[in-house]
Amino acid sequence: MVLALLGALLVGTVSAQIYIPPVFGKDSLDTRPDELSRLYIPPKRIMWVSHDSLVQNKEVLLLSGNGQPELGKRNMCSMYTCGRDTASILLDYGRELHGGLKLVLGAARPWGTQLVRVRFGESVSEACSEHDGGRRRKGYSTNDHAMRDITMKVPSDGQIEIGNTGFRFVRIDLLGSDAVIRLKEAPAVMRYRNIPYLGSFRCSDPRLNDIWMTGAYTVHLNMQEYLWDGIKRDRVVWLGDMHPEVSTIMAVFGYNEVVDKSIDLACEQFPLPQWLNGMSAYSMWYLIIQYEWYMHNGNLDYLRKHRDYITGLIDCIDSCVDEEGNESLAKSRFLDWPSTPNEAGVEAGYRALLCWALDDGAKLCDLLGEKGHAAKCNAIAGRLKKQIKQPNRLKQAAALMAVAGLMESERACDEIISVGGAKDFSTFYGYYMLQALAKAGEYQQALDIIRQYWGGMLDLGATTFWEDFNLDWSRNAARLDDFVPEGKDDIHGDFGDYCYPGFRHSFCHGWASGPTPWMTRHVLGIEVLDAGCKTIRVNPHLGDLEWAEGTYPTPLGVIYVKHVKKDGGNVVSTVKAPDGIKVVSK
């Protein structure tokens, strides 16, 4: 009997088996199990109904239910349309989710299918918005990458699942005239990776605790079949976006196959000599991610699998940098969206990113025994350093130059990054601005900026971090979890920029998670010194915190640290590490 007839498949490293009915026979070998889990989550509150007479007994939708349709109308929410009066209800599921909606329905009138409109929204406003056919205008939503505004028929005395997107709010409109539907349940269907949060962070400031967890949850939602940039859009593997996400995964979950799968997929989709995602900067991020991922997991076999791609990429870069340090990798230079108008600054940051990538590329080649390519990386970097550009007051560029060692971190912070505090920070490159501040010893300022900038999103109702955020947007903005009062700005519909105006703006974007790994690295002070976390340095920086504690996942187990500030400012640390891990201090 072939394995297929036994009806049991072992999926990845998961111990649970997947049983396939024997009738599939050899066809079972062509099936693909769903590696994600599902949760049914009832609404946390009824935000709004069009009229109490049109939507009755709505409170039953807040119950967890059992998912089973029942004939009739007992203990159900009834929605009526009378003439031109449409029955509508807006549900709040309490936090950002990835997945869809399940409707469990009773009897309809007239009996049979009824037409409804279902709108998903990451904000109240988006769930009540109109789409503009993809013209990307502020104040309008889109169905780009995921359907979030759907008109469809639903059954009587049955159930149906609708949608696959990122959302917190759902609006349901009954469209048929003189019609009735009865909703027994309307849970969200959350699709996610069923994995433990091995890393943790707690300190004396609850705001920082919330920020750390929000970054962790933001990335967790984006760990779908592959590692996405955002769960509403683009739902794509972008290598550059992955760097903060992978940093967060290492701090929160440890090893996860989604990283390997996503890197592999990107290399398959964009074989050399193409740049990854068609962007030369994202090929640079590939080298940086590979080195940091190896240092955490110590998986040399995975690096060997990518040997040809790594060395081939280095050859491509080498062919684009002449002896005078002029480079011609690509005409398009992209760091992040907010930096785009500052072309001179982007040029300086781009070259700094390339130097950082080449430094990690040389280390990768040494590990692989590719001494010639390691030397080639160093030679290319040497040529680039003949022309060190100025950051042109761009915080993104100054941060990369500080991280890459092309600019003294103290100067980068004093002259550019620290100017105005959180002003001109960005959700993606804010991570590297924080890294530059840490390198300059400005830990307190970094904590203050985290509280103000990332905390500013929480103040506006965020439960995950956004694709973009400008503090200026918040001056007169209403929260995302309520209707916008007259005279207030809509934080979702009125803002956004570049390719994400208005409601196209993603409110769950993994590249915004930087404070999570940053606080693990610099507040808890956990630094990986040897591949596979074999040696860890613990050097905390509490700033104005009284204490901090947390855990960090390694291939050998979870490390626990606790730091308490005593009278006089001295910090007393407790460190517990698994066997096989050497812990050193300052």
Question: What residues fall within each predicted segment?
Answer:
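Bacterial Sec-dependent N-terminal signal peptides
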Residues: 1-18
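Extracellular/oxidizing-compartment recognition motifs
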Residues: 17-225, 241, 257-259, 301, ...
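Non-catalytic C-terminal accessory modules of carbohydrate-active enzymes
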Residues: 24-25, 31-34, 44, 48, ...
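Active-site acid/base region of carbohydrate-active enzymes
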Residues: 126-127, 169, 178-214, 219-221, ...
